[in-house]
Amino acid sequence: AELPQGLWVRPRLG
C-alpha cells in the first residue's frame, strides 16, 4: 500500500 490510505478513500466517502 504505497498510496495514501486517506487520499483516495477520503474524497470517495465525502
From Swiss-Prot:
<keyword id="KW-0027">Amidation</keyword>
<dbReference type="GO" id="GO:0005576">
    <property type="term" value="C:extracellular region"/>
</dbReference>
<keyword id="KW-0964">Secreted</keyword>
<comment type="similarity">
    <text>Belongs to the pyrokinin family.</text>
</comment>
<feature type="modified residue" description="Glycine amide">
    <location>
        <position position="14"/>
    </location>
</feature>
<protein>
    <recommendedName>
        <fullName>Pyrokinin-4</fullName>
    </recommendedName>
</protein>
<keyword id="KW-0527">Neuropeptide</keyword>
<comment type="function">
    <text>Myoactive.</text>
</comment>
<dbReference type="GO" id="GO:0007218">
    <property type="term" value="P:neuropeptide signaling pathway"/>
</dbReference>
